[in-house]
């Protein structure tokens, strides 16, 4: 499936659910794909051009499940075809770098957020890390790099130099690590 890829990334991206919040925390947090699609439609109509997407299992837990992501991407593509979709590879302390990479390969999303330090806890990019970044770049995936401190910026620069990726990168420095 070919997903919408804007020439320029939208200036407003919504992140309606994250990895941890549940209905007890906020009754409107979308946990199912159906709920997430409905929120995405409403946000798009209000002016958001992109969504940062987490999928949940039947227990409402954040999962790196390629099947659920593909289902969500398919639904979002049909319901909000002009919205840029970014999936997360967030480990949440339960997924390994190998599982993060596997999700990215299996889904090949239009956009992905990658916590650089989560993906490369050794702080030394491996051949597998380089292959992943080259693959996603060649596939046209827009990567948002989550960086929490200056060391993470150095790690990303090292990774991109080793991978010989010179294209525009998208960096986010969250105000706090999760």
Which residues does each PLM region occupy?
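Hydrophobic faces of well-ordered beta-strands that scaffold small-molecule active sites
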Residues: 12-14, 51-53, 83-89, 110-114, ...
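Active-site mouth loops of central-metabolism enzymes
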Residues: 19-35, 88-96, 121-123
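Active-site-adjacent beta->alpha loops and helix N-cap segments on the catalytic face
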Residues: 60-72, 95, 120-133, 151-155
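Alpha-helix-loop-beta-strand connector modules within alpha/beta enzyme cores
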Residues: 62-87, 136
């Amino acid at each position: 499936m070919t997903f919408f890829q804007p020439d320029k990334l939208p200036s407003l991206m919504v992140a309606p659910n994250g990895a941890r919040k549940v209905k007890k925390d906020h009754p409107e947090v979308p946990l199912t794909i159906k709920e997430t699609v409905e929120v995405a439609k409403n946000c798009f109509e209000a002016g958001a051009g992109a969504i940062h997407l987490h999928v949940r299992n039947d227990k409402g837990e954040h999962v790196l499940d390629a099947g659920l992501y593909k289902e969500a991407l398919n639904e979002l593509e049909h319901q909000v075809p002009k919205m840029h979709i970014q999936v997360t590879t967030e480990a949440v302390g339960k997924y390994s770098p190998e599982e993060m990479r596997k999700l990215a390969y299996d889904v090949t999303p239009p956009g992905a957020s990658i916590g650089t330090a989560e993906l490369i806890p050794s702080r030394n990019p491996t051949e597998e890390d380089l292959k992943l970044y080259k693959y996603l770049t060649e596939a046209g995936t827009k990567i948002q790099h989550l960086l929490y401190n200056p060391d993470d910026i150095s790690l990303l620069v090292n990774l991109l130099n080793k991978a010989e990726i010179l294209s525009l990168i998208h960096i986010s420095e969250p105000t706090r690590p999760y």
